[in-house]
Design a protein with these regions (language model features):
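Residues that define the transmembrane beta-barrel architecture of outer-membrane proteins
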Residues: 102, 124-132, 185-191, 245-251, ...
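Residue-level signature of outer-membrane beta-barrel architecture
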Residues: 136-139, 197-199, 254-257, 293-295, ...
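Surface-exposed coil loops of outer-membrane beta-barrel proteins
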Residues: 159-292
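Outer membrane beta-barrel transmembrane domains
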Residues: 304-314, 335-348, 352-359, 365-409, ...
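Outer-membrane beta-barrel "beta-signal"
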Residues: 400, 406, 434-450
């Protein structure tokens, strides 16, 4: 009963909760010399005294970030409250443990990209993609934990129109729909908090959210999936699967066991506006539910459904019912995902999309990766005077590439690589896109802790 009550009062009592962390256990005295056996086991080494408070020493190390609170043995945290197979390995980052039992973590990615998108509607451009993530977590009781997280990007500097990405659509720039382009991420990608309370062995409740967060809808966002680690451009099905990964206003409550997670969210349905440097007004006008199954450290499956209030500014008055399902696999150096999504415009048509992607680390220095997408899209011709306006076309995109990885000590990695993309499309699009457009992309990716 005490734990259930604690779960409902978690945030107000956090500051006053007693910390039963192992870090605060007194050091055990070493055995007397005459009794000490000749044993070099690590278990029998005398405990080191804690640093004096006045030293305020910080333990800096590079290692896997501990799984997010309550993840269990079979899963690690993806974006938001999404789960990924534990065999993918937790996110790596720079850690500092303070004397107050706070675990601080920093992670970042900076990618220089040059892409040449083929065909008459293609374009070429050099851009810099970026993401920096900071988190602070600690136990607040013997059976409760709390985490604060911030994620930032300087991509708004590339301009409102983002970068060329053939057959990608979604959002607007300067009042016009973006077509064959990917919009930049906002400066504030996440400003959130999460609290977990254990209510029974292997079972916990959690509360997650913030002014910028991700609701329980869809798989983990593409930039957080190991299967998409070296793919230089966003999926053209981004607005089917994970466009809600930057949402202004999210509250999620859930329950987690070793094998299952069930959660529900209230959030703002409208996608971010064109002003990428600020924080949009949060609102809770939409909802979603998600169930995730983690039967082993190698498999994760999720199914989710949400009702979004007017998500796209170019479709005023249209709500959306979105349903997604995905299966994730990881073993050794292989990470893969297969996903399906259906977005039903209310009123309007139901548009479906499929995605399959994989990354295979052949060795310490060599990786192969690829993605296949099939998307039904009716936004390729936004001009009302165009005879193809509002026509539905099903596009298949094939992309494959190679990355050469250069470890930079334990702290960072530089990856140099590139990819080629080809497309299958209806003949009615030949005049606009050419018969067989080919796109090529080169990248240099510097990652802190990954």
């Amino acid at each position: 009963m005490r734990r259930l009550l604690f779960a409902t009062l978690l945030f107000p009592v956090a500051a006053a909760a007693q910390d039963h962390s192992m870090h605060d256990m007194p050091a055990q005295p070493a055995p007397a010399p005459q009794e000490a056996p000749v044993d070099h086991s690590m278990h029998d080494m005398p405990a080191q005294p804690a640093p004096a408070p006045q030293e305020a020493a910080m333990d800096h190390s590079m290692h896997d970030m501990a799984a997010m609170p309550g993840m269990g043995a079979n899963a690690v945290g993806g974006s938001g409250s999404a789960l990924l197979p534990a065999a993918e390995g937790a996110m790596r980052g720079f850690h500092a443990t303070t004397t107050g039992n706070w675990m601080l973590m920093a992670h970042g990615v900076l990618t220089g990209v040059y892409t040449d998108q083929g065909g008459p509607r293609g374009d070429d451009m050099a851009v810099v993609q970026s993401m920096a993530m900071l988190s602070a977590s600690r136990p607040i009781a013997e059976y409760a934990r709390i985490e604060f997280r911030a994620m930032l990007s300087l991509e708004p500097a590339m301009g409102r129109r983002g970068y060329p990405n053939l057959f990608a659509t979604g959002e607007t720039a300067n009042g016009r729909p973006l077509v064959d382009r990917q919009h930049p991420h906002d400066l504030f990608m996440e400003l959130s908090a999460r609290a977990d309370v254990d209510i029974a062995p292997g079972t916990s409740l959690f509360l997650y959210g913030g002014p910028v967060a991700e609701p329980a809808l869809g798989p983990s966002a593409f930039m957080h999936r190991r299967s998409a680690r070296y793919l230089p451009l966003s999926p053209i099905g981004h607005h089917w699967f994970d466009s809600t990964h930057i949402t202004y206003g999210v509250v999620t409550a859930g329950a987690k066991t070793d094998a299952f997670q069930f959660e529900g969210s209230a959030f703002k349905g409208r996608e971010p506006d064109e002003a990428r440097w600020n924080i949009d007004t949060p609102r809770l006008d939409s909802w979603s539910v998600r169930a995730t199954w983690t039967p082993s450290p190698h498999w994760t499956a999720q199914i989710s459904h949400g009702r979004l209030k007017e998500p796209e500014v170019q479709h005023p008055g249209e709500d959306e019912a979105r349903t997604t399902a995905s299966l994730h696999y990881a073993r050794g150096g292989l990470s893969a995902m297969l996903g399906f999504s259906a977005k039903n415009r209310l009123p309007g048509d139901t548009l479906t999309a499929w995605v399959g992607e994989a990354n295979w680390d052949l060795s310490r220095h060599h990786s192969l990766f690829g993605r296949i997408e099939n998307v039904a899209n009716d936004e390729l011709f936004p001009d009302h005077a165009d005879p193809l306006h509002d026509r539905l076309f099903r596009i298949t995109r094939f992309e494959a590439g190679y990355a050469h990885r250069i470890p930079l000590g334990k702290a960072a990695e530089l990856a140099l690589g590139g990819s080629l993309a080809a497309y299958a499309k209806p003949a009615a699009l030949d005049a606009a896109y050419g018969k067989a457009p080919i796109s090529g992309t080169l990248f240099a990716r510097l990652a802190l802790g990954q």
